[in-house]
Amino acid sequence: MERSSREHSKYSKANTLNETYQMRMYKDDSTPDYCYSEISVGLSSSSPKMSLSDYFSAVSVTYGDEARLDEYKPLLYSDLLFAESYELDVDINLLVWQLLSSNQDSKSLCVNVLRMLHTYSLGNAYMGGGIYHFSQGTNTETLSDIVDILRLIGRLAKIIIKTKFSQMELKCVQTHLIYYFTGKAYKSLSLSWDSKSILSTSNGYSTSEGLLDYYIRNKLDLFKALYSKNLVYGGNYYLIYQVLVYYYIITNGRYSTGFNLRKDSIKHYNIPNDNPKMCNSILPRKPNLSMMYIRAILIMVMIKDYSPIKLVPLYLNALEIEDPAYMSSRITDGGIRMETDNMASTPDISRVLPAYFNGVKNDQ
């Protein structure tokens, strides 16, 4: 090849990289921002990349026996209110990521969600473009679908603040997540890295949850995935479906007898959590069953439109019910001060529900 030909822009390094990038991207004109099919091998924009399908090819998936699926209706709290304004703008997508991330366990985060809802109810905030905006006396309207999902997040926040879960309750909702992911009621789902795969020794990434965390935070709009009824993930939606479920399993189903700070040593992940203390033994904090519980519900809402199961779980409908007349609790920074003898209750799900969860079937 002549020098002049080699130096032509067609053969330039930049153009080659651009062509490679285009080939690795699923085309979908309607949702161009959610069609990425590659994952960084490291945690920076300059790190080498590989396709999600190759990433998952290094994972072995094992299912337990099939069993009857128990329906569980969580005890909900409608009597919780933080009567204080929240005057900061919030990226709601980042807020949802914080709820899903295993490194973001915080009840103060949930209190802020309730403060946001209180501010919105007073007409001092609106939501648009995925951002919560504080605006005193605003007349800007917010789409009802967006409000419904923020209220759903608020109800999950109440569960985190007030509910003490048993391992059996956590196990039940995790088996529901398996059901929606696979289409069958398996007792368990295990992930492990294939010992024969060269990926497990390449760059130390194969057993690192940080990669999926980085991918989800930078490539997906989690809040849009919650409220939108459309195929927000683009042409490679099944891979994103896997990313979300695998991320939950990897961050909430860890089992390890040792941990190397220099390189992750965990190679096995399993849900449901028969022993959450062992699951989170690598972390310097106490396991939070309620956080693990609400994360499973959030993932189910994100994947249910793609699931082979077309029934909307009853407890997702139940989460849409709230009677403001029973909001008699007030939260302070020092804890919860009870003004009445509030009791958890299982609400009547026969009441009229918002449009997002008003049927037993998902419209594809």
Curated annotation (Swiss-Prot):
InterPro entries, per database record: Fijivirus_VP7-1-like (IPR010521)
Pfam (any one): DUF1101
Source species, domain of life: Viruses
The species this protein was found in: Fiji disease virus (isolate Sugarcane) (FDV)
Official protein name in the record: Uncharacterized protein VP7-1
